[in-house]
Every structure is written in C-alpha cells, then in structure tokens.
Amino acid sequence: MAAITKLINLYFSDRLREIDYFREHPAEVQERQFRYLLANGAKTEFGRDLGMKGIATQQQFRDRIPIYDYETISEFIDRTRRGERHVLWPEEAKWFAKSSGTTGSKSKYIPVTLAGMRKSHMRGPKDIMALYCHLYPKTSVVNGKMLTLGGSKRIEREGDNMMSGDLSAILIENTPAIANILRIPDKKTALIPDFDEKVRLISEQSTRQDVRSFTGVPSWNLVMLNRVLEYTGKENILEIWPHMELFVHGGMDFRPYQAQYRKIIPSPDMHYMETY
C-alpha cells in the first residue's frame, strides 16, 4: 500500500469508527438526529408556530407536523432570502440552491447554510474517500486527480451577501483550497455556465493530468468522456488515463449507462460507487 494511502486511512480512522457506529446503532443515531432537528426547529418562527418545543416523540411529530410542498413554505423561504434569521433555521442562510422548477414554471430556492455544507455536502466526499480506501487498501486513487463535472447555473447575487445558483456550483465555490489541489478542472473552468465550452476546456486541461477518478451524474459524464475521446482521438479512456479506477456517481439510475461505461473504460479494476 502506498504511503499516502496509509496516511489517508490513519486520517480517517476516527470517522470510520463513527460510520461503523451508525451501521450498528441506526435507531439510536436517527433518534439523536431527530432531537437535534427538533431543538433547532423550536428556535425558529416556523417551529414555534407548529409547537415543536412540546414534541417529545416521533409519533407526536407525525401527528402535529403536516407535509408541506414548496409553495406552502415559499413565503418563509422568501423572507430567508431577504436575510431574516430564525425563520426556518436558526443559522443565517447566505446561499440558495436554485432548482430547475420541474414541478412548476418558477425556479425553487433551497436555503443552504454553512453548517449544512460542512456537516453534509463537504463531509460526504470525505466519507466516500474514507470508505473507498478502507474497502480497497491497495488503491492508488489518492495518488492522482479527481475530475468533477459540476452544474452550469451561474452564481448570482440575490442581495446583500445572498447568493444563488446550482448546488454543485455553490459547493465548488465553497470548497476548501486544499481540495482544489486534488481536483480538476480549476474553479474558473468548473463554474463556466456554458456546458460545451466547459467540456472543451476540461478536455484540454485533463488530458495532461493523471486522472484516477471522476464524479458526477452518469449522463453528463458520459457526454464529457466521449468528448475527451474525440479530442484526443483515442479508442478508450485507459489510453488517456491508464490509472483510472473510480467513478462516484449519483442523481439517477446508473444501470442504463453501465454497458457504455464498460465499453469506454475496459478495466476489470474499475469501480463504480453510487451515492445517495
């Protein structure tokens, strides 16, 4: 095992123990999270209106808290976008993930707090790498670059210190500097809104790098990989990146794309890791 992989496993050892605890005690961990959400929800106007402070059990939560659609709580979200705090969550939300509006004509704005990014969106990739290195201790994936294909919605200013955009663009904008050393393309290229231009620049940048993993939605990544093949004139991805070994994917069913990926990445050592 490479020295860097040993260091990675050592660095993530505490987190791996936490993940093992989640597996062994799922009900306890979920109850703890339930209490955390209730305690913070009770500090908000939304939670006070629904009497969250008086909720003691999950059954009481189900009985008292109705199911809301976006339109029902849009007024609360609009107030959050204007900078009000303690409306839906105690922490101020300065970032808003902008959806494509699939269930209506207007885009939807999902508040994203810094704590939410740190405890979920930023922790998730670390957990993936920790689990992968644990499952495959002889991996060399950390010795190369990870190629990421983010969204194409431009980051827009919503007002004083408020920003909105595609969730992946928000995460790229807030990624720690050290992570950018291990990832391509550079932030400027990753945030280009025009998909064709972005893929062209990725093709130019990535073919000169030692890419060993990539991540994103299967459909768009397949388009990107085929563009890279066209750009280089190669038959398959291994001719460009011989050490490619991992695709971390999510967002849609991977099964319709499996055969196409195996065709352009004909390696028995290639791993596909789905996230949810």
What role is predicted for each listed range?
Residues 1-29, 34-276:
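Active-site phosphate/ATP/adenylate-binding loop shared across adenylate-forming ligases
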